[in-house]
């Protein structure tokens, strides 16, 4: 904990946990049978049992920041809300919440489709895509001590502009500040599966719509699948499942109509509701982990879940106190009420909704490690059955705790057992524990909804476990940490396509090391990649990592667990780079059929990730390669006359935090020339994100001067030509590119070309970062296995580096460096 002057007030996690425990105990003192600070601290200590999420962890008992304890909010205006005034109001509310440390979600289905008549100077509506960009830009502007805001934008598949929404992020650099998800109803899914037409309309829920449009459901579904395969977005939200299972929607007429989700998708919310998150560390309930005597302690787990639910209810009270402080600060601000009135009214609405429902978000982390510690393999039916038992126990214990609190503290304001009587989740609880249901009818429940499963990425770093219900990413992996732009001392290893900087480091998964110790392996020894692979094969993590788990079984597991989670589950299905779109389609359809409320696909390499696998080639493929006769490598012959057309790869890179593009012309698959320049709508070249290949066409004008054009095909097969590459780019960069193209043309080996580029002594900082981008663009063409002569491994100091898939790999110690 620190203040705005940089003064530090805590020196250890113990200090932080005592701060939290003392505040929880203070709230407990208001109610019967209070927990002591020591009881709470013992569950928090060493992140062993219960772990509050980032906002509660940072904000509880922190008087140095005027901020909310809520992790997530959803906003949205009632009634007709697609006027410019309403759109601007949502934009302002989004920013006001983000500056208080909250992630925000909102739905765009209320915005009129493109071309609709409007009563202003434009005469027709622009549709929802321009407003996606506005909300995205607002998110990126909000500085949260070096972090960006988090935003979820959603739209109903029924909206006539939903196809434009689905395509909005396919152009590189567009809507970079938001996650996007499509709300898909059962009718659309069935029509897509059966290849039948589907009717879109606006307003989407109107009995007398102003706009109707019949489309091919399968064609639009195929686009969703393709875009998810290409760029990991959009995510899909199975909206009928969400509404059907939602307990808060039993009170829809009282303001609890679910309209969107938080940025990660695990909490569907109504407008102006919010949620605080906490997770229970499942690994800590495995007794004798990684041994034949291992078992899960259900009794201890149920006892701790009950306390966790109680703590979460206390945090609702703490949040209401924080909201009062925020509102007092707004009152005291020197601006006029005209300026600050909107923010004050926003927090009034949030306070009202929070006190009405007292929503909580008790979740879990370390599911993957729990399964491994019990000697099971993630993705098997046996492991899924165990997980369902654990989550059923969690749901019953949390709801029993909420019912007990209703008896002691009072039920949430609008509780009505009759409204909930037909809810599928409540009926499952009734069947599993009839006495719990009877008590709930008699006394009510303290919280309108209780459970979720969040990604818990940063939380899992504290617990040193797998995150959420995910399997281990890799037992050994490279991790990226986003760098605070205000921190001048940090080392930057990677800059993504939108200019955010990251530090990279190699990580051994802690629980994998625990397994190694339990099975007699030396954890101090430096292993080669081959040795690590051999060790992993003997462990319960084998064939149970993010990239090689049974993906279909993982989706079915999510659906089975979802039956015992009243909110939703945030899960990403990680896929290798070489999977096809048919698999993505199959996984999405299975997610719908299995009862998942949402699903997100990430194909390795489809966008910049936080963790990067250092994967080996498939063994069968390697064995086939080894069977081939060894042919001496022969340099391609020099071609004196350039063909009129050359195949071309498009490679994007960062130059001093600007988005640049390289066009690499290929002759027989070998780089022949390179053109580089700014990718910009005004001064450079604007290309859709999906364009990765094309042609460079050389034309000679009447004056005898050569001109180079770039041609590509769009998704529908139509060709687009960008004329005059040389005229589009800065002359200084153009001249350096001509120099590099000259040595490529005369077949200097690529690794030597890269050394030449690296040795250029250039004074301008921009040109120096440009040459690094050129090096990266060319490295992918180095033949795998080429030795990096004269270079030493930074880890072991040996001259044993070889190029592999554009990266430098050490044959001696297995260390790797990309970029």
Regions found by a protein language model. Name each.
Residues 1-34, 120-134, 144-256, 287-291, ...:
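Conserved, charged catalytic cores of large soluble enzymes
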Residues 437-439, 615-664:
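Short, Gly/Pro- and small/polar-rich lid/capping loops
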Residues 21-33, 41-120, 128-131, 142-145, ...:
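Function-dense linear segments that define catalytic or interfacial modules
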Residues 793-796, 810-813:
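Short cysteine-rich clusters marking metal-coordination/redox-active sites
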Residues 184, 245, 250-252, 262, ...:
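Terminal amphipathic helices with adjacent charged low-complexity linkers/tails
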Residues 41, 202-204, 208, 304-351, ...:
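Internal maturation/activation junctions in enzymes
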Residues 265-267, 319-320, 426, 439-446, ...:
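Catalytic alpha/beta core of large soluble enzyme barrels
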Residues 814-819:
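Short Cys/His-rich micro-motifs in 6-15 aa windows
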């Amino acid at each position: 904990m620190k203040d705005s002057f940089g003064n530090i007030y805590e020196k250890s996690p113990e200090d932080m946990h005592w701060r939290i425990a003392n505040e929880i105990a203070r709230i407990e003192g208001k109610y019967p049978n209070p927990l002591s600070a020591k009881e709470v601290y013992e569950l928090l200590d060493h992140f062993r049992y219960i772990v509050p999420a980032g906002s509660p962890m940072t904000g509880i008992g922190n008087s140095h920041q005027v901020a909310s304890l809520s992790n997530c909010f959803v906003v949205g205006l009632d009634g007709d809300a697609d006027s410019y005034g309403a759109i601007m109001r949502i934009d302002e509310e989004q920013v006001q919440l983000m500056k208080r440390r909250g992630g925000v979600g909102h739905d765009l289905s209320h915005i009129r489709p493109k071309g609709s008549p409007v009563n202003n100077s434009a005469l027709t509506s622009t549709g929802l895509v321009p407003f996606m960009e506005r909300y995205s830009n607002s998110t990126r502007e909000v500085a949260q001590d070096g972090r960006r805001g988090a935003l979820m934008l959603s739209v109903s598949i029924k909206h006539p502009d939903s196809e434009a929404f689905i395509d909005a992020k396919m152009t590189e650099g567009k809507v970079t500040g938001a996650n996007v998800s499509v709300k898909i109803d059962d009718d659309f899914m069935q029509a897509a599966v059966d290849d039948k037409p589907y009717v879109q309309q606006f307003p989407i829920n109107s009995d007398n719509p102003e706009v109707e449009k019949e489309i091919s459901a399968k064609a639009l579904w195929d686009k969703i699948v393709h875009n998810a395969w290409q760029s990991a977005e959009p995510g899909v939200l199975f909206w009928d499942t969400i509404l059907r299972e939602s307990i808060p929607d039993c009170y829809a007429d009282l303001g609890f109509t679910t309209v969107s989700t938080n940025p990660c998708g695990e909490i569907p919310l109504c407008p102006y509701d919010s949620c605080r998150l906490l997770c229970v560390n499942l690994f800590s309930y495995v007794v004798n982990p990684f041994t034949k005597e291992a078992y899960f302690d259900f009794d201890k787990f149920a006892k701790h879940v009950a306390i966790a639910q109680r703590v979460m209810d206390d945090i609702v009270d703490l949040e209401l106190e924080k909201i009062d402080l925020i509102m007092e600060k707004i009152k005291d601000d020197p601006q006029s009420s005209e300026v600050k009135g909107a923010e004050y009214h926003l927090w009034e609405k949030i306070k009202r909704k929070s006190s009405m429902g007292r929503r909580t978000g008790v979740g879990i982390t370390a599911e993957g490690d729990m399964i491994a510690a019990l000697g099971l393999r993630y993705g098997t039916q046996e492991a899924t059955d165990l997980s369902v038992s654990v989550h059923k126990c969690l749901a019953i214990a949390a709801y029993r705790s909420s019912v007990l609190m209703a008896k002691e503290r009072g039920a949430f304001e609008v509780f009505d057992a009759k409204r909930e009587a037909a809810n599928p989740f409540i009926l499952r609880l009734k069947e599993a524990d009839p006495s719990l249901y009877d008590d709930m009818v008699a006394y009510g429940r303290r919280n309108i909804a209780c459970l979720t499963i969040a990604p818990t990425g940063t939380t899992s770093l504290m617990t040193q476990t797998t995150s959420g219900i995910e399997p281990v990413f890799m037992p050994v992996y490279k991790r990226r940490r986003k760098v605070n732009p205000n921190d001048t001392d940090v080392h930057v290893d990677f800059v993504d396509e939108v200019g955010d900087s990251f530090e990279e480091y190699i990580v051994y998964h802690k629980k994998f090391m625990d397994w190694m110790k339990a099975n007699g392996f030396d954890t101090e020894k430096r292993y080669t990649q081959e040795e690590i692979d051999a060790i992993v094969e003997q462990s319960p993590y084998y064939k149970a990592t993010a990239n090689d788990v049974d993906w279909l079984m993982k989706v079915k597991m999510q659906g089975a667990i979802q039956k015992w989670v009243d909110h939703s589950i945030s899960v990403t299905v990680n896929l290798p780079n070489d999977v096809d779109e048919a698999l993505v389609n199959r996984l999405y359809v299975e997610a719908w059929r299995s009862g998942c409320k949402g699903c997100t696909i990430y194909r390795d390499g489809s966008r910049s990730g936080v963790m990067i696998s250092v994967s080996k080639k498939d063994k069968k493929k390697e064995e086939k390669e080894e069977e081939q006769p060894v042919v001496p490598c022969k340099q391609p012959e020099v071609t004196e006359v350039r063909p009129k057309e050359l195949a071309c790869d498009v490679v994007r890179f960062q130059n001093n935090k600007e988005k640049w593009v390289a066009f690499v012309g290929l002759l027989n698959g070998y780089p022949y020339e390179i053109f580089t320049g700014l990718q910009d709508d005004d001064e450079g070249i604007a290309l859709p994100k999906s364009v990765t290949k094309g042609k460079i066409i050389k034309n000679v004008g009447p004056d005898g001067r050569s001109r180079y054009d770039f041609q590509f095909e769009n998704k529908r097969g139509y060709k687009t030509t960008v004329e005059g590459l040389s005229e589009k780019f800065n002359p200084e960069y153009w001249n350096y590119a001509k120099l590099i193209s000259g040595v490529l043309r005369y077949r200097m080996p690529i690794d030597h070309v890269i050394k030449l580029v690296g040795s250029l002594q250039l004074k301008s900082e921009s040109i120096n970062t440009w040459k690094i981008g050129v090096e990266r663009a060319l490295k992918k063409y180095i033949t795998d296995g080429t030795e990096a002569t004269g270079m030493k491994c930074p880890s072991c100091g040996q001259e044993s580096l070889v190029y592999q898939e554009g990266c430098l790999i050490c044959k001696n110690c297995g260390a790797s460096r990309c970029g």
